[in-house]
Regions:
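Active-site-proximal or metal-binding-adjacent scaffold patches in catalytic folds
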Residues: 1-82, 91-143
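Walker B catalytic acidic pair
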Residues: 87
């Protein structure tokens, strides 16, 4: 007798498996990308942790410890880079003041456009995504 793929039990098992795979991918790729961007733009941070966050994509503590939501992996790379650069700028400016936004937009001129798009995504499992290479160069249009 086969398993009903539409049963609640099967759906929960599939969701658990998807989350585990997503987390494993995030634990590999996000720290690598963060280190690459930090080096490129001369930021220093203390540590990076990848885990599930309930309502945000990332955070940076006063000690420059960066935490990233593993659901970032479902976003296009432009948005992932937006979040990573945002957290790196917090290593220089903790609050979202004028200096923060000037520094952020000096690195990512299309930040406002990407931020608007990012607000349409949620910090949970997204059924499908289209991502380009992590080496994609942002264009003037931002996407």
């Amino acid at each position: 007798q086969g398993v009903d793929a539409f049963s609640k039990q099967a759906q929960l098992a599939a969701e658990r498996g998807a989350k585990k795979a997503l987390k494993l991918e995030a634990e590999t790729l996000l720290p690598q990308r963060l280190h690459s961007l930090a080096s490129k733009y001369e930021f220093k941070f203390n540590s990076v942790q990848v885990r599930q966050l309930s309502s945000k994509w990332g955070s940076c503590s006063q000690n420059h410890d960066i935490t990233l939501n593993y659901y970032l992996m479902q976003l296009p790379w432009q948005m992932i880079d937006y979040v990573l650069i945002h957290e790196l700028v917090h290593t220089e400016f903790l609050s979202h003041g004028k200096d923060f936004w000037q520094r952020f937009e000096s690195i990512l001129p299309e930040a406002k456009k990407i931020r608007k798009l990012l607000k349409t995504y949620r910090t949970e499992v997204i059924s499908s995504t289209l991502r380009s290479s992590p080496n994609t160069v942002l264009t003037e249009d931002g996407l």
